[in-house]
Amino acid sequence: MTTDNISEFLKKASNYGLQEFLDIMGELSQESTKKGLLSRQQKELITLGLALFKNCHRCISIHSHEATRLKATDLQLGHVKKVLFFMNATPHGESDLWEDWVLSWKEYSYSKVNERRQFREMVAIAISIVKQHEKQIELHLNEALAVGVSIEEIFEIVPLVMLMDGAPTLSQIPVLLSCYEKYTDNRENS
């Protein structure tokens, strides 16, 4: 799927009703297991982060087992848990603590190993979408793109989120697209 096709698909999906949504879920289930830019292991670890955030014990068990089967290391599993810790500590609303939280996140997320930072941002984007937290979505989308995650890789995260969270994810697709448009506009103007 090309970026334009994915973008069009996501725009349409945000306006669908229940039957269309169920049809999409069937397609997404198949799509999420296909080979793409993200490895199967990355997808499992991101999905594990979502399962932990949602506190779904059955999902945690399934995705922990699958990530381990795909040779995820204890270090990688630890990164998922640390991202979850940070995401759960996010200030709510218009808190004065937001800027301090962002600085703490950036200190944690920074790594000399670029792939670690990319991975942390991808897990954070997925959780931000489930949280329906616009500031988080914008922050993690911008950070991910800045460290080399492609928009296509980010679009591969959306089906995982939809499979774990269902219909509420649809309300965040316009937010994700708006943040991406803002990011590209800012890059073009700088």
PLM region spans:
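Short N-proximal segments of mature Sec-exported proteins
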Residues: 44-54, 120-135, 158-164
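Long amphipathic alpha-helical coiled-coil segments
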Residues: 147-151
